[in-house]
């Protein structure tokens, strides 16, 4: 029996601490998968992940799109959230992931319908330009899905909208131009817009969003980081989000650096990016090896993508690929993965702060190293979710409108299960390019 099997068996089901024990919420179809002969081995076969993903994807669509839109139309539901992160556009992303694995054209049709609805809402309600939490997500997914469907007119329409976003004056404005109105982070700021551009170029071809639009934004992010670190001798780049110097992937250094690593960097830029990563590596918590949530924060509690070792593991894995001669990045990525293995089986399910996001750290390390132990660990976490995802949501949820969302709910495990059909091709949704 592999170490991944031993670990999950020892952890047991959520609720063993008395917090919700005996209150299991049954899901007949998905629970049926666990009655297979392979279930006692904990790590389920690929076919089971695919079936579980398809079943739960259908539930996500029913809850957020079919039933959800009806509730909105009747006035009985919440205001439509048109974002990838917690909103309806996350369902579109999930359907796109399903289509790419199964080639079910109904998924592509559903995705296109959702995007059209979100486009109408986002135009009036969303001021941000990022992929995860802004209009960049609508434009990007709209162009990609239209391209898959062979709809050149709609593809060009959404691409045109994205290029209009690129003209936002604050995007390339550095500190010397007074560019402090827009943040630098992945969720709401400049890095989040650049991520959307990288995603578009991946699907539609390099140069779809041209370098002359992106390079000034990269320069503005680097300049802002240097100004932010002007009073800090040890760290070359620092950024504030609502006054706090976050380190994590969502609003902090890990996410910003991950995006910067995809662009051509000058010798000075490389020195500052590497120096910032090494500053973070040298200031890990000495006992656990975990990373602080923010500069100077002494609390060692969170192991997740948004804050802590998970996001850093993925960013360091990328740094190792970009700088293969710098062996310390590879070693630090592996060490961060060990933190996730020891402490990452948490009581939430989503990509941002739950087990699904933590499993992606192992998939990133699997692609980096080729070591099957990381594939086994990802499957162990994913198998735990097959058993307990819906129960975990019911135990921990205080925001029912996010229960099926991509980053805080059940759509996250769906994407993870689909990615386990071909782990070598896996990508953390909205983070890895």
UniProtKB/Swiss-Prot annotation:
GO terms for cellular component: extrinsic component of membrane. It comes from Arabidopsis thaliana. GO terms for biological process: carbohydrate metabolic process; peptide modification. May play a role in signaling. May be not involved in abscisic acid (ABA) signaling. InterPro entries: 6hp_glycosidase-like_sf (IPR012341), LANC-like (IPR007822), LanC-like_prot_euk (IPR020464). CDD domains: euk_LANCL (cd04794). Belongs to the LanC-like protein family. Gene3D superfamilies: 1.50.10.10. This is LanC-like protein GCL1. Pfam families: LANC_like. It comes from the Eukaryota. The gene is GCL1. Disruption phenotype: No visible phenotype under normal growth conditions. Residues 1-22 are annotated as: Disordered.
